[in-house]
């Protein structure tokens, strides 16, 4: 489990920052939002397991968002990090910890990503406005999920990336619509108990994002399906492939390691804020659907 695997890490304390020097973060890509979060991810080199860490000593004292540092991002990094930022918006908005404060940031960041990521991908070396809007979206999404946390898509992406050496943003891109379908079912088993959170309204939450990003439809179900299609179209526009298999992950190796990957994803710290409680069998099926490109609700 994570608790056993991270025993040595949990015994250590992060040094108190800011007494001798400020922790200043200057991002050079638009995706992780790390310049605005108290999170880090480390990999155990012996086991290959990725672990997310959370501590306010990891939160920078200052973030400098300067588009000049982002103009030379290659297309692959632009697309992967951009969809990573979109995943931050979607998971923060659906999170059981979401609030009015995080919702506004997630909504505006998501709309910027849909509008400006294709431009940043196509003409990123010269389109300063697109780079600026993506830089802002990344930081805004970072602030949103720093306070609302994420969900099981990131849990699964952490382990998929570690087991099969896929970039983190690509892993999120391959999984996000499968997780959205999983979360948006009627009457899902809720993850946590909070006074402001009686039961999940995840379909309605996704539809709110969809409407803010220009999606219309006769009812929530139609709007949700159109939103899924809009996300898939964005991914295609920025050169992201459709399935895990398309990225050259060997089928036998994937299946052989699937159970271990599933167990570690369930134990990941991001799982706890997901709006629907996932069984390990359901995580496993979402991995399989993402590998083979099966668009079915788990």
Give the role of each language-model region.
Residues 170-253, 296:
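Gly/Pro-rich interdomain helix-loop hinge
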Residues 97-105, 121-133, 148-153, 191, ...:
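Flexible, glycine/charged-enriched surface loops at secondary-structure junctions
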Residues 31, 139-172, 267-272:
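Glycine-rich phosphate/pyrophosphate-binding beta-alpha loops
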Residues 37-148:
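Carboxylate- and glycine-rich phosphate/diphosphate-binding segment that chelates Mg2+/Mn2+
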Residues 253-298:
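Short, amphipathic C-terminal "tail helix"
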Residues 62, 83-91, 107-118, 135-139, ...:
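Predominant activation on well-ordered alpha-helical scaffold segments within soluble catalytic domains
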Residues 1-10:
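Single conserved hydrophobic/aromatic residue that forms the stacking wall/gate
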